[in-house]
Amino acid sequence: MLGRFFGRGAGGNWRPPAQELAFASQAGFDTVQIRSDRHALEDELGVDAAELGRLFDEHGLEPVLELLVRYDDDGGAATRALEATLPDLQTVGVLRVHVHPVGHVDPAALTADLAGAAAAAEEAGLLFGVEHNAPGHRLLTRLGEVEALLDAVPRLWLVWDVNHTPADEVGGYLALRERFSLVHASDTPLPETNWHLPLGQGTVDLAPLRGFDDVPVILEIGGLPHSGGPGLDTDEALLDSLAWLRGPS
């Protein structure tokens, strides 16, 4: 359930995978999300895929991967990102991979690209998902867009980001639960979205998150410049957010 929001060189609390996975295991997390912006895991993390897979196995943790993909009126970005990382995914032992699309592309081209990537991932035995964006971005910002995309691409999974979701759309996203491959959890002072605060520092209703026993809930609490970050993903904040997520003992 751990995902440092910012990576190496981005001003957050990044550290080498051996240290990060040891912390996650000792703290009681069961899943760790890797984020790749350049689609080369060794370049991102400083260790090769075989060593990374060994570390995940050693600590008994599930690896999941987020690929940031940038569209510039050109379809195919998600498929290219998946193809570039697929050998590493299989070596590490990743089951759940998703893209976080940014930029601009025609909706039909986006749908076609995600359909192709989802089919390729399914053939490789992977669950391939897409993360929706917060209002103010260009791609997949409203519930209706997400519903239409999932209807058009039955193989595609969804990563629900609670911190991207206006309060009046929460119920609609929960109705899509059977399509969730991951949930991203952080807090925000609604109606503002996309602050990525530690849990308990905003106004998000956390209660629905406590019922996801079959889907990993990833803490993305790094913060953004407008919300006091990056750097809010300290060990103490992650442990406190994990306690919020688990609720009263």
Annotate each PLM feature.
Residues 2-10, 14-28, 53, 85-88, ...:
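Histidine-acidic metal/acid-base catalytic patches
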Residues 21-25, 30-111, 164, 215-218, ...:
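Structural motif corresponding to the early beta-alpha repeats
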Residues 43, 108, 137, 141, ...:
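Residues that form or flank phosphate/diphosphate-binding pockets in enzymes
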Residues 58-61, 120-126, 151-156:
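Short helix-capping segments at alpha-helix termini
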Residues 107, 111-118, 127, 143-146:
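Hydrophobic, well-ordered secondary-structure segments
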Residues 127-142:
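Conserved anion-binding
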Residues 161:
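Active-site glycine-centered loops adjacent to acidic/histidine catalytic or metal-binding residues
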